[in-house]
Amino acid sequence: MSPDLTHRSPEELTPEDSQAIGDLARRAARADGVDPLNEESLLALRHRTPGRVHVLAHDQDRLVGYGTLAHGSAEVVTDPDARKAGLGGRLLDALLEHDPELLLWAHGDMDGGRRLAASRGMVPRRPLWRMERPVAGEFSELPPVELPEGISVRPFVAGQDDEAWLRVNSRAFADHAEQGRMTAEDLTARTQEDWFDASGFLLLVDDTRDGEVVGFHWTKVDQLPVGEVYVVGVDPERQGEGLGRVATLVGLHHLADRGVETVELYVDGDNRAAVTTYGRLGFERAAVDVQYGPPV
């Protein structure tokens, strides 16, 4: 008997639904070695973020599949014991009914994700690289931080710096599908996560302009010994001053001081300038996610 599909609005999601989806994602991650849902999707579950589509697949009382869609971006996850029976395709079709032009994430770009995308006529549209570098042990020495004259570094202060950071973030990521649309609510949700540490949310400020925020490096340590370059940004008005490299190094030194041994980051594989910059800082590609969509 085929699993039953149920559509849920964010308001209709129950705590039991969210728990079951989290359990399903963990089962899939153990089997595949990669998380099937990104941070935005997981936060949306916890906070029941408006405007998101949820499709749940139950085999009797057991959740065996889940699909989610928001802002034209979709993810699908199936239970390892319920695969190769067309369930992933059914979930994707349900999401395509809401948005025929959606883009589908294939985390880890494994064979199953490729086949699912190809079965619906989708082609690779956007590669997202995970890059890594050591910050402890042999061959891990970091270049020194050389702050430009007039620039200093301080931690983010919640309730004081929100508006200034959101302004720089939206300008720095105006062309970025996810990061550029971050709202005050999104910022607050992340600062309330267990991993959040204000001392690792570092702002570059211009002391000659009343402490104006001109760049930032938000680091993340969820579980040692791995840390993350969560997001680095520089105000476009200040590009060309070397602040991107400075911000990156400030955060890397902070992570090393916290006891992190390996730092990872995510970058669009098509962004050759960013890939080159990170490569010069010792980062190498470790994995890739691919977003699939209709042919352009």
Curated annotation (Swiss-Prot):
It is an enzyme of class 2 (transferase). Its EC number is 2.3.1.189. 1D-myo-inositol 2-(L-cysteinylamino)-2-deoxy-alpha-D-glucopyranoside binds at residues 39, 178, 220, 228, 266. One of its GO terms (molecular function) is protein-N-terminal-alanine acetyltransferase activity. Keywords: Acyltransferase, Repeat, Transferase. Acetyl-CoA 1 binds at residues 76-78. Pfam families: Acetyltransf_1. Acetyl-CoA 2 binds at residues 232-234, 239-245. Residues 8-146, 151-296 form the N-acetyltransferase domain. It comes from the Bacteria. It catalyses: 1D-myo-inositol 2-(L-cysteinylamino)-2-deoxy-alpha-D-glucopyranoside + acetyl-CoA = mycothiol + CoA + H(+). InterPro entries: Acyl_CoA_acyltransferase, GNAT_dom, MshD_Acetyltransferase, Mycothiol_AcTrfase. GO terms for biological process: mycothiol biosynthetic process. Belongs to the acetyltransferase family. MshD subfamily. Monomer. HAMAP family: MshD. NCBIfam families: mycothiol_MshD. Catalyzes the transfer of acetyl from acetyl-CoA to desacetylmycothiol (Cys-GlcN-Ins) to form mycothiol. This is Mycothiol acetyltransferase. It comes from Kytococcus sedentarius (strain ATCC 14392 / DSM 20547 / JCM 11482 / CCUG 33030 / NBRC 15357 / NCTC 11040 / CCM 314 / 541) (Micrococcus sedentarius). The gene is mshD.
